[in-house]
Amino acid sequence: MSTGSSSTSEITEISTFKGQEQALRAGRLGTAGLLLSVLAASAPLMVVAGVMPTIFGLMGIVGQPILYVILAVVLALFSVGYAEMSRHVHNAGAFYAYIARGLGATAGASASFVALVAYSAMQVGIYGIFGFEVSNLFATYLSTELAWWIPALAAVAVVGVLSWLKIDLNAKVLGVLLLIECLLVIIFDVAAVADPAKEGLSLHAFNPDTLTGAGFGTALCFCIAAFVGFEQAPVYAEETSSPQIVVRRVMFLAIGFVALFFALSSWALTIAAGPSAINAQAGKLGPGLLFGLSEGVLGKSFTDVLHVLFVTGMFAAMLSFHNVVARYAFAMGREGLLPAAFGRTNKSSGAPGTGSLLQTVIALVVVIAFAVTDHKPTGDPTAPVLHLFTWMGNIGALGIILLMAAASVAVIAFFVQRGAGRAQVWRLVASGLACLALLTIAVLTVKDFDVLVGAGPGSVLSWLLPGIIGLTLVGGLVYGLVLRSARPDVHARIGLGNEAFQLDKAAEAAAAGTANM
């Protein structure tokens, strides 16, 4: 396998010799299907309606569009090396497989559990805000009080069923929901620009001076969560028709789309409210900012539809993250990091059924736990939004930032160890710069974690919640060391995926040939 060039031989299918039950079905996804699947995780409408008002209102950052551009540059630098790595390693456990190849199997074992916890936390957290918003819809349009956990548990069941189906069917469901919500946001953006507030078409939001203040670091941490999803593309490499081409293309398309879409949408919000008034309005209305501005320029009927799509967009994100967790569990089961049952797929759909069931059970337990401890009246956002959604979302975001930083180092090590450092020098420089930027963001995230989760200064949550990722990281390292000592055969397979099975196949063939001599 050449590592000094970006050219690779054509691979028509990736499977294992142990049968299709231990292989994800190849050829299920093309560029469009994969792009829609990873973009669904970014939940465009949830970001515009939920994240952006928080940054405007609580952190006082008017120049939010600049933040998305800055992060796009950082993540594009990260993707230069990450995408090249995806041409050489096709594994549903993308992050941990890359880290294992570059930094060793023990580091890969640790990364696998960090990835599992991080993506699971992000997925489960969305059930909170989903249940809360569905409850609001019932109260608004049906005058019916509904506890948030009822629609949340219903969503757990529906997502669990859909995840057992073929991934191309999942992509179609995600694609339809994503396209509709993006279209509605674009309509709002155009309407806001066409009918601006009294300050007119101001470009004040693109002025770097608007980034000054104590809220900059925290705002950067909030914004990076909007990009989460693009890095999932290699997770589906085994299910794409041409992974060497499709995965790389989708990552850069996703980063470009997210940066442009969110930069323009956050600017449109400042135009609709006025740059001088946006922070005050966002602080007063919160997630209602978008809907209030929308009703003013597009009317109540459009805004009602926007409310519904806000909910379906969250559902799409839950399904997207669920699929990723299931595939990480599959990859870990296939390589012995989890019980072998997780490394098998459904015979009918080719989906990682046991991994999907694992995430369904985790979501069920967490939602029930938050529901049981919620003693607030119906309609109160404390448990579902301020706790479940905010806590879990920030735990997940921190884990993913650290994984990206580690993967950047792994990319450098991977190519240098193979004597391809000179041929890949610019990609390695890009990875190094990305690592420094991502570590800076990680430090800011931990430093401001009390602000991110809405806790007071000195709150136990400021170290307890990020400590979950730290504990997982250390626990994974210990587990990796135990495997190296007690089960060296399993340790040697970490990160190899299908290649480990192909090596076994070659060894068995060689042994059979020797026996027949």
Give the role of each language-model region:
Residues 1-63, 75-76, 200-207, 483-517:
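Membrane-interface "cap" regions at the ends of multi-pass membrane proteins
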Residues 15-21, 25-135, 233, 447-457, ...:
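Transmembrane helix-boundary motif of multi-pass solute transporters/channels
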Residues 16, 20-25, 64-65, 141-147, ...:
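Helix-loop-helix junctions that connect adjacent transmembrane segments
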Residues 29, 148-198, 228, 249-259, ...:
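Membrane-interface loop-to-helix entry segments
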Residues 51, 393-403, 425-517:
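A generic transmembrane alpha-helix motif of multi-pass inner-membrane proteins
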Residues 54-64, 136-148, 168-177, 354, ...:
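Transmembrane helix-loop boundary segments of multi-pass membrane transporters
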Residues 91, 114-129, 232-239, 300-340, ...:
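Membrane-helix boundary/coupling elements in multi-pass transport proteins
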Residues 97-99, 104, 136, 140, ...:
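TM-loop-TM module centered on a large, flexible mid-protein loop between adjacent transmembrane helices
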